[in-house]
């Protein structure tokens, strides 16, 4: 009660009511009828609010006094006032009207209580629903937390699985590279094996030919030992030697197989030894491979030129003394086959080194000379010179940087781009017999090889006039011209 009374005092409603009365009184004649009625209704509403607060205080005060305290005061003061309120307009309102008003008031109170109970029940239901909703929300939050935990666990497992998969992929890639290297090695071994099988077939054919020739010669020898004079006369008219092939023709197959094998050994052994030697002075493997390839090509060119010159000198020497059933050309070739050691290989080595010194596609440190690989050049020249005595002679396939790669002529090197169509540079030339490739070469294929090969062509030409190796090579050169030989050697 004290709180309600304090609020009533603090709000000072009567002062507000007095101010509104004063304001209405001043402007009463100015306002219209509706405005004055609105002001009057406003004051009645304010008065009813104040009376409601006073009745609240009255109720609280009566409750504080107990069941019977203040009864006399209420009877003497409140009830007469209430009765006067109901009888103020007795002339206009009858007793039946007052009774109906009381009944309406009671009915309104009952409806208010019913609405209040309904409101409280609805409020209780809403609170229950709110509690259940909160419980469900808490469960959803817990499920969300569990889901987050499960998601984090799944992410960690996925990351672990991804790392393991990447490691496995890297391992498989490394195994694939190893398998590809082994495959390339096996392919090379297979090519070598094919070469060996070809050589074996050639040797078998040669053995068969020699056996047949041996049988023919034995028959002729038996006939030559016969005492019949007719046979002797026929032998003197048509000598047996005219039907016998030369030594070069008899050994052509075996020399062919041996020279092909020497060319393979030159690639597999001498080339790698020279490559290891050059890598001590040059860090670029590509430059070293270019040098050895050009050395092999220049060796064949120099050996073919030396063979033509040597053959011309032998033909000139033998032309004046040649007798016999075989042709002069066969005799010249047979002489060269029998005297391959007369080939002036040192002159060819000097020519190869001079050609390499002015080749624009390779460069070399000035403090080192190509004489380092003179043993490789010497073996290449000897093989090339001996190959010219075969029928048909063996030669190298034409090659140029930036050409279109051919599986028939070359094998790709291990560091090649296997989808590139052009040759960047050659590691080893292909060996031809006529137009047929009998030994594949090796090439490196890369994209943009044509532009790289053009850009390398502008390297400067080196001068070797002061190289000390030149005097060394010149001092060991010799001139085995067959003109200096006696007729007994021929």
From Swiss-Prot:
Key regulator of mitochondrial quality that mediates the repairing or degradation of unhealthy mitochondria in response to mitochondrial damage. Mediator of mitochondrial protein catabolic process (also named MALM) by mediating the degradation of damaged proteins inside mitochondria by promoting the accumulation in the mitochondrial matrix of hydrolases that are characteristic of the lysosomal lumen. It comes from Danio rerio (Zebrafish). This is Mitochondria-eating protein. GO terms for biological process: mitochondrial protein catabolic process; mitophagy by internal vacuole formation; response to steroid hormone. Keywords: Coiled coil, Cytoplasm, Lipid-binding, Membrane, Mitochondrion, Mitochondrion outer membrane. Residues 112-210 form a coiled coil. GO terms for molecular function: cardiolipin binding. It is found in: Cytoplasm; Mitochondrion outer membrane; Mitochondrion matrix. Residues 224-253, 455-490 are annotated as: Disordered. InterPro entries: MIEAP (IPR026169), MIEAP_C (IPR031981).
């Amino acid at each position: 009660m004290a709180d309600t009374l304090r609020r009533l005092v603090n709000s000072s409603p009567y002062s507000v009511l007095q101010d509104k009365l004063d304001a209405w009184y001043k402007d009463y004649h100015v306002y219209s009828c509706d405005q004055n009625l609105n002001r009057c209704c406003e004051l009645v509403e304010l008065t009813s609010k104040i009376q409601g607060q006073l009745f609240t205080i009255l109720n609280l005060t009566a409750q504080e006094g107990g069941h019977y305290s203040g009864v006399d005061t209420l009877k003497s003061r409140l009830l007469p006032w209430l009765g006067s309120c109901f009888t103020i307009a007795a002339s206009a309102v009858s007793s039946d009207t007052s009774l109906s008003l009381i009944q309406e008031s009671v009915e309104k109170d009952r409806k208010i209580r019913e609405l209040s109970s309904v409101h409280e029940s609805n409020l209780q239901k809403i609170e229950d629903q709110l509690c259940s909703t909160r419980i469900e929300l808490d469960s959803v939050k817990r499920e969300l937390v569990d889901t987050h935990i499960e998601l984090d666990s799944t992410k960690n497992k996925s990351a672990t699985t991804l790392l393991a998969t990447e490691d496995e992929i890297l391992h498989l890639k490394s195994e694939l590279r190893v398998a590809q290297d082994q495959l390339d090695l096996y392919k090379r071994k297979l090519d070598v094996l094919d070469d060996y099988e070809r050589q074996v077939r050639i040797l078998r054919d040669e053995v068969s030919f020699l056996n047949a020739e041996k049988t023919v010669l034995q028959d002729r020898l038996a006939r030559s030992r016969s005492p019949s004079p007719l046979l002797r006369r026929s032998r003197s008219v048509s000598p047996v030697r005219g039907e016998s092939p030369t030594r070069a023709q008899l050994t052509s197959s075996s020399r062919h197989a041996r020279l092909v094998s020497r060319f393979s050994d030159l690639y597999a052994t001498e080339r790698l030894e020279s490559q290891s030697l050059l890598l001590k002075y040059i860090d670029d493997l590509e430059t070293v491979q270019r040098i050895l390839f050009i050395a092999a090509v220049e060796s064949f060119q120099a050996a073919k030129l030396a063979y033509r010159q040597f053959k011309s000198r032998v033909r000139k020497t033998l032309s004046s003394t040649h007798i016999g059933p075989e042709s002069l050309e066969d005799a010249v070739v047979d002489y060269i086959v029998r005297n391959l050691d007369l080939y002036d290989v040192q002159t060819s080595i000097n020519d190869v080194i001079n050609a390499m010194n002015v080749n624009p596609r390779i460069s070399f440190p000035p403090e080192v000379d190509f004489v380092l690989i003179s043993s490789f050049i010497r073996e290449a020249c000897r093989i090339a010179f001996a190959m010219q005595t075969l029928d048909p002679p063996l030669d190298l396939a034409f090659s140029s940087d930036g050409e279109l790669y051919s599986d028939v002529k070359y094998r790709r090197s291990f560091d090649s781009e296997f989808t590139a169509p052009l040759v960047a540079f050659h590691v080893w030339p292909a060996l031809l017999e006529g137009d047929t490739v009998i030994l594949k070469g090796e090439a490196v294929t890369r994209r943009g090889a044509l532009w790289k090969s053009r850009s390398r062509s502008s390297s400067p030409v080196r001068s070797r006039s002061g190289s000390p190796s030149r005097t060394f090579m010149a001092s060991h050169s010799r001139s085995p011209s067959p003109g200096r030989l006696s007729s007994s050697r021929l």
